[in-house]
Amino acid sequence: MAIVELNRLTKRYGKRRGIEELTFSIEEGEIFGFIGPNGAGKSTTIRLLLNLIHPTAGSAKVFGKDIVRDSRDIRRDTGYLPSEVHYYDDMKVADLLRYSAGFHGKLDENRMRRLAERLALDLSRKIADLSFGNRKK
C-alpha cells in the first residue's frame, strides 16, 4: 500500500512556480528523503502534504487520506519539524515536551520518559545546552 501518493501535484505562487505536476508514491516500508538544491520544492511539497499551504492543482494522499479534505487526520498522525526551529534557550527538554503535548491535550509523563530514554535525551537539560542534533530530536 502506498503511504504517500502525489498525482500531478502543483503549487504556483502567482506567476512563479513552486512545484509542477509532481507525481510519485512511497510504499509502506520504503525509506524516502527529499534532497535537492534551494528552491527545488522540497519544503513546498512537505507543506502541501500537511495542508499548511494549498495546492494549485493536482492531488495527494497520505495514509490513503486526501491532503485537503482529511488534513486534520493527517496532521494528527504525522509530525513536521521545519529546518529552522527556534526554542526558548532557558526551557528544559521536559518543559518543551509538556508544552508540545499541551497542543493536543495528551500529556503522558510515562510516555514522555520512555521517548526521552529511547532518544537518549536528558529531560532536565536546557535546550541551549543541547547539540544541534539533539535539538532536532
Task: Name every feature range the model reports, one short phrase each.
Residues 2-137:
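ABC transporter nucleotide-binding domains
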